[in-house]
Amino acid sequence: MHTPVLFEHPLNEKMRTWLRIEFLIQQMAFHPQIASHADALHFFRNAGDLLDVLERGEVRTDLVKELERQQRKLQSWAEVPGVDQERINELRHQLKQSSSTLMAAPRIGQFLREDRLIALVRQRLSIPGGCCSFDLPTLHIWLHMPQAHRDEQVASWLASLDPLVQSLSLILDLIRNSALFRKQTSLNGFYQDNGEDADLLRLRLDLAHQLYPQISGHKSRFAIRFLALDSEYGIVPERFDFELACC
């Protein structure tokens, strides 16, 4: 029985930021019912990391530009004979709607940034053990509030990210589905190719080989080196087949 493992690697800084945002929001939403100190630290640590990422660049501007670019791509696809016009029109409508919603929304992450509890916890996360009850009595008492109260507050925090989530999910879904997986073969653990202006590499490896990729490159050219999980006794086959999509 084959167990495929998917690896994704960004080929530009914009995609790197988007994948990090997606990952952090998924972590925040994974267990929205905060019932313990461990649950709280998991949520607040990811919320703090998300705010750090959002503060580094013009995320909204980049997303709006990408939504417009995807609309232009769909417009060109609409002129291809035999294409599913209904599906294309549906996607174009979703892109326009997401763009309008994103443009009308407040500054991304501002609702989280202005929350007093998130700000207090965020300040202490950089200190080893800095979230003990004597360091953060506010968090301590919050964790003793009724579960329904905490659930409602977490739901409002996550809901404030909806315009971002909606746009980012649509963009990443379109990019991920823009290319098919094709079988490739590495020689002595190495593979390289042209990026063809791709934004994202997606690799599927069989878990049985216990190999992982080390990827370097950019949109015009990239290289992949396969390494054994067991660095001491693991073996990298002379010829290794894997699946690759340049999106």
Swiss-Prot record:
One of its GO terms (cellular component) is cell division site. This is Cell division protein ZapD. It is found in: Cytoplasm. Its main location: cytoplasm. It comes from Klebsiella pneumoniae subsp. pneumoniae (strain ATCC 700721 / MGH 78578). Keywords: Cell cycle, Cell division, Cytoplasm, Septation. Belongs to the ZapD family. GO terms for biological process: division septum assembly; FtsZ-dependent cytokinesis. SUPFAM superfamilies: YacF-like. The keyword Nucleotidyltransferase does not apply. The keyword Disulfide bond does not apply.
